């Protein structure tokens, strides 16, 4: 029933640049094998593109990594991949992520989740079957855009509109989102540099300043990874 409602209320059928490029990713890379393996696993199983790859297609950037979301649980993802002889590893399985390896391509496949408990660094999650529930736990609207293999967008938080307008909007309460994971302060800066020519919202800056010390709770590995991404941002040096 949830998938039916998604198709009616939250999906947009596109025949434009975005749709065609997402279709090309499906048809011209081994991603089609992932879609076949998971979508055919059961009558209700489904996998969708999510996050950065869609954001980059919309902004006509080079897609250099592909993240996928699925309503299968991690052990079911493993079984679906085994059924099609697709290699994978389970290093992120505790957080719901299985990484499939096909030729030179890596695909991170993450089960739908909802947060049970957060501490500013990590979240304790519970797996879900609800796409809107998964979208609601993500950090920014521009990262909560999904697409099926045919390029039909599922965008419950109006992320495409925000991306087109250069609006970097937290999903839900900004302070709650930051306190769940203080890395989101740096992610906000990176996405703002990349995608916005607008002025910062004063309230957002107040909240960031109020919580800036939370960054000290983060591991050096996570901080270094985010700083590397920040320095590679299109607008980092203007």
Q: What are these regions, as identified by a protein language model?
A:
Residues 1-238:
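Catalytic cores of the polymerase beta-like nucleotidyltransferase superfamily
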């Amino acid at each position: 029933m949830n998938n039916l409602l998604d198709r009616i209320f939250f999906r947009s059928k596109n025949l434009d640049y975005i749709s065609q490029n997402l279709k090309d990713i499906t048809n011209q890379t081994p991603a089609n094998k992932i879609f076949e393996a998971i979508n055919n696993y059961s009558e209700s199983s489904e996998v969708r593109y999510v996050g950065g790859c869609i954001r980059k297609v919309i902004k006509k950037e080079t897609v250099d990594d592909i993240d996928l979301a699925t309503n299968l649980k991690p052990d079911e993802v493993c079984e679906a991949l085994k059924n099609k002889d697709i290699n994978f590893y389970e290093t992120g399985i505790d957080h719901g992520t299985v990484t499939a390896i096909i030729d030179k391509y890596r695909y991170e496949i993450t089960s739908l989740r909802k947060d049970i408990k957060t501490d500013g660094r990590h979240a304790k999650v519970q797996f879900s079957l609800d796409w809107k529930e998964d979208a609601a736990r993500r950090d920014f609207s521009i990262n909560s855009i999904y697409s099926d293999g045919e390029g039909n967008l599922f965008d419950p938080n109006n992320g495409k509109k925000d991306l087109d307008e250069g609006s970097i909007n937290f999903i839900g309460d900004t302070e709650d989102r930051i306190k769940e994971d203080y890395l989101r302060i740096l992610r906000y800066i990176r996405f703002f540099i990349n995608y916005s020519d607008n002025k910062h919202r004063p309230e957002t800056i107040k909240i960031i300043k109020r919580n800036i010390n939370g960054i000290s709770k983060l591991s050096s590995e996570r901080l270094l990874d985010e700083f590397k991404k920040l320095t590679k941002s299109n607008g980092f040096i203007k």
